[in-house]
Amino acid sequence: MPPGKYRQMMRDLYVKEEKEMVQNEVKGWLLTGTNPALYTIKADYEVFHTGSKSGYLGAIQPAEEGQFGTMMQVFSAKNWLGKRMKMSCFIKTKDAMKCGAWCRIDTRNGDLLQFDNMDNRAINGTTDWNYYSIVLDVVEESAAIHFGVLLVGSGEVWIDGIVFEEVDTSVLSTNLASSAEELPLEPVNLGFDEL
């Protein structure tokens, strides 16, 4: 899914997040997405990479390419303002159509500032535990940091060993959101003469 389409979907999702959340037994974690009823989350005591359990997100009914579920949290950006933040984790998959870790940074009004859903390096199929990271800048107007793991379509995904840490600018950002650097420096075709 292209970043722009995903951003719009997540922006719409943010507005109705509370209405669409499915109750779960994993403290601090929410199950949401385009079709949360097609998915389940739990703490898995049998499959884990570090410690004694992992987070699990799986499709419980057939799900199609455009449908996704996400196991997520939201926290304040206050302690991260002005910093480059790295979220790292370990992910394992089974028959996953498409999945990955994700992180989104929003303003107080819910406008997107920074975003990465690993769409350009999505995980597919069955994989053993692998290390993944997302690096985003928490600019001064940031208010909320959303993060988690998403599963597009069917399959299963486990996440473990999630760590947030500050990194310096030598660590490249993975931001997929449109930036001003991609915009033209001046308006174009104002007379509509060019085709």
Regions found by a protein language model. Give the residues of each.
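Extracellular and organelle-lumenal recognition/adhesion modules and their flexible linkers in secreted
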Residues: 2-195
